[in-house]
Amino acid sequence: MGVQTCAVAGRGVVAYLLAMTAAQNDRSASTPSVASAHDKILIVDFGSQVTQLIARRVREDGVYCEIVPFNKAEEAFKEMKPKAVILSGGPESVHEAGSPRAPQLIFASGVPVMGICYGQMTMAAQLGGEVEGGHHREFGRADVEVKAQSKLFEDVWSSGSKNQVWMSHGDRITKMPPGFSVAGTSPNAPFAIIQDEKRKYYGLMFHPEVVHTPDGAKLIRNFVRKIAGLTGDWTMRAFREEEIAKIRAQVGKGKVICGLSGGVDSAVAAVLIHEAIGDQLTCVFVDHGLMRLNEAEQVVDLFRHHYNIPLVHVDASKQFLGELEGVTDPETKRKTIGRLFIEVFEAEAKKIGGADFLAQGTLYPDVIESVSFTGGPSVTIKSHHNVGGLPERMNMKLVEPLRELFKDEVRKLGRELGLPEIFVGRHPFPGPGLAIRCPGDITSDKLDILRKADAVYIDQIRKHGLYDDIWQAFAVLLPVKTVGVMGDGRTYDYVVGLRAVTSTDGMTADFYQFDMKFLGETATRIINEVKGVNRVVYDVTSKPPGTIEWE
């Protein structure tokens, strides 16, 4: 999946450019995984846009897994010694010259293997089957009919049943490899599911990892638990203990600086590091004046007074707003904010002095996306707008305690660490903050209006018990004014747009279908309680074609 350039809070204030340097890659490779003592599954990535969903499904079942590009899979297999392997889908055709293959070492090892889409095709071709390309393509929903019993289907699908799945393939198998049999068919795929239960090989032409295959997560669970025999010992409690030991070993008696954004990633990283090394950690919170109502005060109170973590609070709001005056282009806003953040953060770090390490809230998707499945820098990467090359500029080593976690796992870890739910469960917030929720030029007055309108909107959502049902909700102050009537007088005030979406990963999203009574009540409250607003509209655009944020 791609990475939005507005993801500072989601990735941690000091997340670096995703295209990591060779030196950083060398450092990562030499650092033992905290999962070294756990059962592991290796996921070989052939370039599917949903490979990360496979990993999330496996992790949800309590089993640690890692994603590696196909051309690094042999090395990873030898190092990890996984108990099972999953071959992902991908955009290539098995018939194309130079198309990727799984290492033969995997098939010679005796571990269970599940091939998904392209993974099924290359498994069949490599094990002696035949595959043809370009005919009878299937994309979208399809029904698979179960033709034989399988451990993969236990307590999920019964023989003869038809079940909805999500197809996305061009190639198809025409002759099975020796030892395989048909377990399921679809109208355009007579070998939709194949298996060799003796060797524990399973091939699926559909994608079990996506929500459009309703029983897909159960099929993956059966592969993980019943076929591979893994028990699920990957927990946030275990991760917490192991990562604390790892941080202590890495840092020793050194000093660490961590940037706080108010987002969950940087908050969890800071609390975990502080638990490991205490006051060797100093946090720097740069308030750019673009945060939500009372958010800066909440961050300072939590870390300085609740956790007693050394915190430098820098109110740079005048500097940021001064530089943003008259700026209307969204990308220029981002770059301006990013440049200023680097300048302010670097200046404060120099004042602290003597720091050996820079802590970052890098997540596992950042690590995955730093390299494409072909092994080079991913062409889909967009630069984070915040710190760029801070680690290199400041000659500091990196501490990245969350680099093996997905976002939902970070939230679980936050709860394990005892962070308040208002921090752990809050909706994603863009790094440029309200700057990209205020299209057009930015002023202090506009930001005050937007903060208050957003606070009323979120308060309404919480009061109606809807907050946890929504992926992200926020208000936007539109750069237009409209005529209204309040009392006996004419008004000419701003329009507020309301946005709320449901999503599983932020890559696609549907607008949340509020009850009209709720929208009416919310609009009335905003107009009555927020001076400068006389009209409220609701955004019913899905993603795609729109994006979640307006800028």
Curated annotation (Swiss-Prot):
It catalyses: XMP + L-glutamine + ATP + H2O = GMP + L-glutamate + AMP + diphosphate + 2 H(+). Pathway: Purine metabolism; GMP biosynthesis; GMP from XMP (L-Gln route): step 1/1. ATP binds at S261, G262, G263, V264, D265, S266, A267. Gene3D superfamilies: 3.30.300.10, 3.40.50.880, HUPs. One of its GO terms (molecular function) is ATP binding. Residues 40-233 form the Glutamine amidotransferase type-1 domain. Residues 234-426 form the GMPS ATP-PPase domain. GO terms for cellular component: cytosol. Its EC number is 6.3.5.2. Pfam families: GATase, GMP_synt_C, NAD_synthase. GO terms for biological process: GMP biosynthetic process. The active site is at C117, H207, E209. InterPro entries: Class_I_gatase-like, GATASE, GMP_synth_C, GMP_synth_GATase, GMP_synthase, GMPS_ATP_PPase_dom, NAD/GMP_synthase, Rossmann-like_a/b/a_fold. Keywords: ATP-binding, Glutamine amidotransferase, GMP biosynthesis, Ligase, Nucleotide-binding, Purine biosynthesis. HAMAP family: GMP_synthase (MF_00344). Homodimer. Catalyzes the synthesis of GMP from XMP. This is GMP synthase [glutamine-hydrolyzing]. It comes from Bradyrhizobium diazoefficiens (strain JCM 10833 / BCRC 13528 / IAM 13628 / NBRC 14792 / USDA 110). The gene is guaA.
